[in-house]
Amino acid sequence: MDSNEARHSTAHYFLEGLNEIGFDYLFCNFGTDHAPLIEAMASFKRAGREMPATILCPHENTAVHMAAGYTIATGRGQGVMVHVDAGTANSAMALHNLCRARIPVLLMAGKAPFTTRGELLGTRDTYVHFVQEPFDQASVVRPYTKWEYNLPSGVIAKEALRRAHTVMESDPKGPVYLTFPRETLTDTWSEGQIRSYPAERFGAVSARGLDAGSIDAIATKLLAAERPLLISAYAGRNHATVAVLDELARFAGIRVVEFNPLYVNLPHDSPCHGGFMPAKALAEADVGLLVDVDVPWIPSDMPDNPATWWVHIDVDPEKRNFPMWTFPGNLRLQGDSHRILADLLAALKARADAGFKTRAAARVAALAEEGKARRDQAAKAATNRGVAGQINPHFLCATLAKALAPSDIVLNEAIRNGPVVSAQMPRTQAGTLVGLAGGGLGFSGGMALGLKLAMPERTVVQIVGDGTFYFSNPQSTLSVSRQYKLPVLTVVLDNSGWAAVKEATLRVYPDGEAKAGGDYGATLSPDMNFAMMAEAAGAHGELVSEPDAVEAAIARCLDAVRGGRSAVLHAKVTRL
């Protein structure tokens, strides 16, 4: 080792490593554990050196979901920094959502210093350093991560970062977790001791296509099918898949149902779009394709046909993070759905005869008629505007849809009003819808900000219930929106409670004591004014309870957002 070589802290090399793995942003909720990194960032800034830009988030839920939104928009995973065990705990719900959605994000947290009497730079120097050391910090998020690691020495800082990035970006993708004690970050190393790990030699593993025999087997089944059905939830994470799936469905006459969609998987105006509930089609299908879907239907409500032949095409067909998963699959195939569907379409085109094309065209025509009937039904539902103090959410969502462009992005976290959003606000372009993969409510606020950060030219609309609005840490999201000039429209469909809780109780105990007493433990305060919360953060706020006021209120909110200011439309809708 050359004694004249420059020496730098682990934190310095850590920032270099973050650059090398290609992070654009670090979404941060800093604490005492990050002092060496903050010092290194200041040094980089003074020297004019490149490093990821930092976005400060008052709550970790905002930070993690914001990173996820940016990742969805760009296809490049990002980094999040939080404070020791407490920040990790605040991040756990968001990590759950990212795990289920297979979104690659690197969550980084410090650990309490391990020296107590000044033995090393970075030693414990405040009360919290003694109380923020659990026996197993990573256990908080272990169920939701693909990989975890504690950095033992700065000499492998870049190696650890490359490993984290490789794991999170390898299919099936997902979040990873890295921790580091403060003394490790302050330790110094010469430049010659630190090695880089370039992506071209240490990069991620991507899902591939299928062998010709598997493609041929699926094609054979489809060529003979009379009532083919395809169910998907997240094939549209790759925008190119949407057009391929549409062409395949039209060519082969396949009904496509999106059950709990995370993205636009098929344009909602496609003649083959079969809506969002597969129940009727399940009973009739003779050939079924599950394509990138975790929960294709609810077996207790929608029994499948035991005679249906199923093929499951998925980046994760074994559902390795689901302790119990028993949906049928005569053929289970892991791979990239875009490549597989494109190969399947080519195989069908090569083998289809005139009779097949005639039958497929007839199915497409019949599906188109069914689609028109669904749209007519949705339009009829929207004609009921509601009454004073209880706006019909169908009417509100239909009115909002008319004010949006096809390229605008909708985040659907309306939960029990989610089907209303789906029915009244069809999205026809890839990348214009984001739904909830996990069970952690409150994802859409942070994700909306991340999407807006990545695509500032787009209008981003977050639709939530009042219960979900609380979960989304709105003070934090409104603060980030204001500080970083990321205007988003939030629509709160306020039914004064948790409809999901009430409905779940009635499903299990339809004639029980809760129903008799009318108490479901689900009623929230009806007197909140979320518009005032928005105004306190410098955003535009509207509280609307009269149907006649809806259209003008939406227009004012969109004018504010398109003028650079976030808006919250608090709408009093049909109560529980």
Label every model-predicted segment.
Residues 1-5, 152-155, 307-414, 518, ...:
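Phosphate/pyrophosphate-binding active-site segments
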Residues 2-351, 406, 478, 487-490, ...:
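N-terminal alpha/beta PP-like core and its mobile active-site loop of ThDP/TPP-dependent enzymes
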Residues 11-21, 29-41, 368-457:
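Active-site diphosphate/adenylate-binding microenvironment
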Residues 45, 71, 168, 249, ...:
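N-terminal cationic-hydrophobic initiation segments that often serve targeting/anchoring roles
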Residues 116-131, 282-285, 325, 333-334, ...:
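Thiamine diphosphate
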Residues 179-183, 233-234, 413-417, 571-574:
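Short, well-ordered beta-to-alpha junction loops that form the rim of enzyme active sites
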Residues 233-238, 384-385, 465-468:
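Conserved short loop/turn motifs at secondary-structure junctions
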